[in-house]
Design a protein with these regions (language model features):
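Membrane-integrated ABC transporters
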Residues: 1-38, 47-97, 103, 110-115, ...
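An intracellular "coupling" helix at the cytosolic face of ABC transporter transmembrane type-1 domains
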Residues: 13-17, 139-140, 156-165, 169, ...
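Transmembrane helices of ABC transporter permease
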Residues: 21-28, 170-221, 294-307, 324
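Hydrophobic alpha-helical transmembrane segments of ABC transporter permease domains
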Residues: 24, 75, 85, 107, ...
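Juxtamembrane helix-loop junctions of ABC transporter transmembrane domains
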Residues: 32-41, 91, 96-147, 151, ...
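Short intracellular "coupling" helices and adjacent cytoplasmic loop segments at the cytosolic face
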Residues: 48-52, 120, 128-152, 156-158, ...
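Helix-loop-helix
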Residues: 185-199, 273-344, 349-350
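ABC-type nucleotide-binding domain
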Residues: 358-359, 365-609
Length: 609
């Protein structure tokens, strides 16, 4: 339960006023519920003409408050009966009973209503915390986690926390209040009978706790299967073209069926165990009622009766009212472990360490004036495999640098170090003589623009995709950027122009159009440093020409670092950096490297065959 209280402290604390309101409403509801049951005693006495006892008024503050209230209430009722007759008083008591029940149910509704903002607020806060954490984590974290698993945690696991934990908050606020108030009244009515009843409470709690512990372990396993399901759905949506091309529908369907069947089997066991909460608590409660009926009957039938029949019936009515709060607590005891299991999976994200640490006192870097310098940079992934080894490189401002090499040479890793998507294992990277680890990532990345081989667009309008990351961009600025990127003409041909939604990942556009939107976005940002990842590699000839024209304009006014897969595109580079197995093996202009007859020439000749 320690973990549960930590969750409440973490997420429910901002909603203290709602919790306080719920507590007040539940107390009022319980008090008026006791009043409604207390009215049963005089009603039963009138109906069955029971109780020859004569009540005398006790001055206030002369005895125990409970005794004063009870005695004087019966005194006034007996006086009214003498004056108005039992029939009229019975009608009055029944009307009062209805009014009390109306007040009680209104308080009950109020208690439930003030809990709604807590439930919805906790879920919203939790999702925002996970989402913000995802945005802050380095790229290395996501290379180790499946996207489907992350989606499952932000959707299914958070939903399970809502169903299993936040839904129990109301039970945990309301039911202890009801139980405490009811028990207090029961002790005042007959402490012997109540003490006898409490003896059975530890047995009920022990049975429910044993089932709850087993339920948590099974819930963790069930949520893992849910993650596997979401991961396969994500893979299927991303690879649908390949699945159809290779006639793999049946194979993927069988794989999905196996995962969902395993999840169904595990969920069956969890649901069956959770379903046992109600009948188990019902059985234990009924056994307790039966035993209390027997013991209470002996108290009434004994020579020295400590409770009369109408009071005993009211006692049993209140006691039976405790059964429902106890059953609710038992459901909470079964539900909380499921939520804790999901919370453990959520905490894998929330507690993940961000190794791209922000400096405590960041140095200012608002512009780029001199050079980018890599000093003896080495880098290894967490697996231990070294990707870069002792790389040193200086890129003066305004230079166009191309990085080439075979697949796996470390080209992409090298450029990912500059915006601090990763930090080098050894060595340092400096911009204008300032170590980039001493600069806030926000200031650093504001200086850098990216155009990737596979343009990353969002399910939004063309305008919003171009203006992405540029606060307050105007239509005039967006149009100007689109014209430079050779994108304006095809945009205005769309039915809604710049307000056209381009679909998921820009599926409504061609490859060349997507790339030109990506270039327009970089132009609008207008960064002094540009990183290109072979932006024309997958385009047809016409699209490549238009994209290359846009890139030429973009590159002419800034420092450019481009990864080149096709060596024919690097002829204009001021310097070509040739990499092999994580090291710089050659550098120079195209003609110089060809004349050198080394590794670059070998790569070039392989592509021109």
């Amino acid at each position: 339960m320690k973990e549960f209280w930590q969750i409440l402290k973490r997420y429910v604390a901002p909603y203290k006023k709602y919790v306080a309101g719920s507590v007040v409403m539940n107390i009022l509801s319980a008090v008026f519920n006791v009043f409604s049951f207390s009215l049963l005693i005089p009603i039963l006495q009138i109906l069955f003409n029971v109780g020859e006892h004569t009540y005398e008024f006790i001055p206030w503050h002369r005895g125990m408050p409970f005794n004063e209230i009870t005695n004087n209430a019966y005194y006034y009722i007996s006086q009214f009966i003498e004056v108005y007759g039992p029939s009229r008083i019975l009608l009055a008591l029944c009307l009062i009973f209805c009014v009390i029940v109306l007040i009680k149910t209104s308080c009950y509704f109020g208690a439930a209503a003030v809990m709604v903002p807590i439930r919805t607020g906790v879920v919203k806060d939790m999702r925002m915390e996970i989402y913000d954490k995802i945005l802050s984590l380095p790229l290395g974290f996501f290379s180790q986690e499946r996207k489907g698993d992350i989606i499952a945690r932000i959707s299914g696991d958070v939903q399970e926390v809502e169903n299993s934990i936040t839904s129990t908050i109301e039970m945990l606020i309301k039911n202890p209040i009801l139980i405490i108030i009811y028990l207090t009244v029961l002790f005042r009515m007959s402490w012997e009978l109540t003490l006898f009843t409490i003896v059975f409470a530890p047995a009920m709690i022990g049975v429910m706790s044993a089932i709850a512990r087993k339920l948590k372990a099974q819930s963790i396993e069930a949520q893992r299967y849910w993650s596997d399901t979401m991961s396969q759905v994500e893979e299927t949506l991303g690879g649908l073209r390949i699945i159809k091309a290779f006639l793999a529908e049946k194979k993927m369907s069988d794989r999905f069926d196996a995962v969902t069947e395993a999840m169904r089997s595990k969920n069956n066991r969890v649901a069956i165990r959770q379903a046992s909460a109600h009948p188990v608590s019902e059985l234990l409660g009924s056994v307790m009622i039966a035993i209390v009926l027997w013991f209470g009957g002996t108290l009434i039938l004994g020579e020295h009766s400590v409770i009369d029949a109408p009071s005993f019936m009211a006692y049993m009515a209140i006691l039976y009212s405790i059964i429902q709060p106890i059953k609710d607590l038992s459901r909470a005891a079964y539900g909380i472990p499921k939520g804790l299991a999901s919370m453990e999976r959520i905490n894998v994200i929330l507690d993940a360490e961000n190794n791209i640490a922000e400096p405590a006192e960041p140095r200012s870097l608002s512009s780029f004036e001199q050079s980018i310098e890599l000093r003896n940079v080495s880098f290894s992934y967490e697996s231990g495999r070294e990707v870069l080894h002792d790389v040193s490189l200086t890129i003066p401002k305004g230079r166009n640098i191309a990085i080439v090499g075979a697949s796996g040479a470390g080209k992409s890793t090298l450029v990912d170090l500059i915006p601090r998507f990763y930090d080098p294992t050894d060595g340092s990277i400096l911009i204008d003589g300032v170590d980039i680890r001493e600069v806030s990532t926000r200031d650093l990345r504001a200086l850098i623009g990216n155009v990737n081989q596979d343009p990353i667009l969002f399910n939004d309008t063309i305008f919003n995709n171009i203006a992405f990351g540029v606060e307050g961009a105007t239509m005039e600025q967006v149009v100007a950027a689109a014209k430079i990127a050779n994108a304006h003409d095809f945009i205005i041909e769309k039915p809604e122009g710049y307000d056209t939604n381009i679909g998921d990942r820009g599926v409504m556009l061609s490859g060349g159009q997507r790339q030109r939107i990506s270039i327009a976005r970089a132009i609008l940002k207008n960064p002094p440093i540009l990183i290109l990842d072979e932006a024309t590699a997958s385009l047809d000839t016409e699209s490549e020409r238009m994209v290359q024209d846009a890139l030429d304009y973009l590159m002419s006014q800034r420092t450019t670092i481009s990864i080149a897969h096709r060596l024919s595109t690097v002829r204009k580079a001021d310097e070509i950096i040739v990499m092999n197995e994580g090291r710089i093996v050659e550098r120079g202009r195209h003609d110089e490297l060809i004349a050198l007859g080394g590794y670059y020439r070998k790569l070039y000749e392989m592509q021109t065959l």
